[in-house]
């Protein structure tokens, strides 16, 4: 494989990655904690797109903080796991070439 072929291959990988990232923006990951009292939603690129807090938690700051941290951490882990899977998938496709 010469340099021009490698360059073309890398351009193809970049384009595929960009398309996957764009598609990933539309994927939503939702995590809940406290029996659903707190719900957070992230898109596939890790942006927080929704946050729901049950009104009963507004008077219990400590519980709200714990539930928020739990839901946020779980949501972030889901996004990161998806990103790892996409990366491995792309590497697998690259290795086949």
UniProtKB/Swiss-Prot annotation:
Q: What are the coiled-coil residue ranges?
A: none
Tell me where on the tree of life, at the top rank, the source sits: Bacteria
Q: Which InterPro entries match?
A: YbaB-like_sf (IPR036894), YbaB/EbfC (IPR004401)
Give the matching Pfam families. Answer: YbaB_DNA_bd
Q: What are the GO cellular component annotations?
A: bacterial nucleoid; cytoplasm
Q: Where in the cell is it found?
A: Cytoplasm, Nucleoid
> What Gene Ontology molecular function terms does this protein carry?
DNA binding
Could you list this entry's UniProt keywords, alphabetically sorted.
Cytoplasm, DNA-binding
Function description: Binds to DNA and alters its conformation. May be involved in regulation of gene expression, nucleoid organization and DNA protection.
As for family, the record states: Belongs to the YbaB/EbfC family.
Assembly behavior: Homodimer.
What protein name applies here? Nucleoid-associated protein Hac_0048
Source species, please? Answer: Helicobacter acinonychis (strain Sheeba)
